[in-house]
Amino acid sequence: MVRLLISTGEVSGDLQGSLLIQALQREVERRSLPLELMALGGPRMQASGAELLADTAPMGAIGLWEALPLVLPTLRLQSRVDHVLKQRPPDAVVLIDYMGANVRLGHKLRRWFPRVPIIYYIAPQEWAWRFGDGGTTQLLSFTDRILAIFPVEAEFYSQRGAKVTWVGHPLLDTVSVLPDRQQARERLGLKPGQRLLLLLPASRQQELRYLMPTLAKAAALLQQRDQSLEVIVPAGLASFEKSLQEALEAAAVRGRVLSAQQADELKPMLYAAADLALGKSGTVNMEMALRGVPQVVGYKVSRITAFVARHFLRFRVEHISPVNLLLKERLVPELLQDELTAEALVQAAIPLLEDPAQRNEMLEGYRRLRQTLGVPGVTDRAAKEILDLTKT
């Protein structure tokens, strides 16, 4: 029997965790090895077969101010999880993204279980930040292996003394052939010639507050220009659905919110039919790129967090979208903090909706990006590495 603990948070982490769990189950079946999976994650990981010790999908936050409301719930959650892990020690630990919480957990588990391997899959993107190497040193102090998803990430951590395996980007495993565009449009109820705009605002509650009103206002302005423009907002979590609908209504947007379940079921249809996406920075940018959906990216945090990051942490980053970070160019339009207005979003969106040359330039950049991400079979390679490192 192998007992694994997988820890992640937020909607994107829950998705990546579920894909890894499915790959682990395939690998243990091949090895005829009984497997027990405990998880800090979300409903997708639970549906894939993990025992959910705590639902961390709604608990992500960026910034000191934004994280304050989560302090007490996080402490209560940690107390429950600590009790379970002391009663049922894991044979290996897999940390997925979710930097702050996973770094704290990694330090704790290294003290408690010095011989248990700790594997970081989808490590913090410190290669893209200008914080110095303090966080990297912390991470390496408890990590036995890093499974890198980007070549630049593998090089960064390897140069600093980590044992690293580059497995490729896990979204490659989800990019099958899209449905026929015309069939997808018919399934979604789109009329001939009608454009589809996706709004992708949030994997965290704070992002709904800071991003969705602006995205909705931009959608309303675009509908004034093109009255037939259809707007769809897929919800990342069921708890987001009401807030998303209220934001559309407040901006007088003619559109629909898909429930989290509908969004999962219709995702391939949405990507095949979409003409443009307006959304946050993060994993969703890579998903749009791999699916060939032109996009405009925005991000905003509280003024307090922005001030602290700029003046005290000396936070500097060339780009906020992973697409641009990896290509080292501004392929995807980005709007950050005060730049992020409805009018600026519209100005960036119009060429992508109306100028075929602009669209084709972005799609060509997507093709170049994909060539840097490895080959499919990513989660299977990660699962094999994890089980090879596990003490049985």
From Swiss-Prot:
EC code(s) of this entry: 2.4.1.182
Catalysed reactions, as listed in the record: a lipid X + a UDP-2-N,3-O-bis[(3R)-3-hydroxyacyl]-alpha-D-glucosamine = a lipid A disaccharide + UDP + H(+)
GO molecular function, one term: lipid-A-disaccharide synthase activity
Keywords linked to the UniProt accession: Glycosyltransferase, Lipid A biosynthesis, Lipid biosynthesis, Lipid metabolism, Transferase
Taxonomy, superkingdom: Bacteria
Pathway of action: Bacterial outer membrane biogenesis; LPS lipid A biosynthesis
Coiled-coil segments on the chain, per record: none
GO cellular component: membrane
Keyword match Secreted: no
GO biological process: lipid A biosynthetic process
Top EC category: transferase
UniProt cross-references to NCBIfam families, sorted A to Z: lpxB (TIGR00215)
Family: Belongs to the LpxB family.
Protein role: Condensation of UDP-2,3-diacylglucosamine and 2,3-diacylglucosamine-1-phosphate to form lipid A disaccharide, a precursor of lipid A, a phosphorylated glycolipid that anchors the lipopolysaccharide to the outer membrane of the cell.
HAMAP family associated with the record: LpxB
This protein's name: Lipid-A-disaccharide synthase
Organism (species): Prochlorococcus marinus (strain MIT 9313)
Protein's gene: lpxB
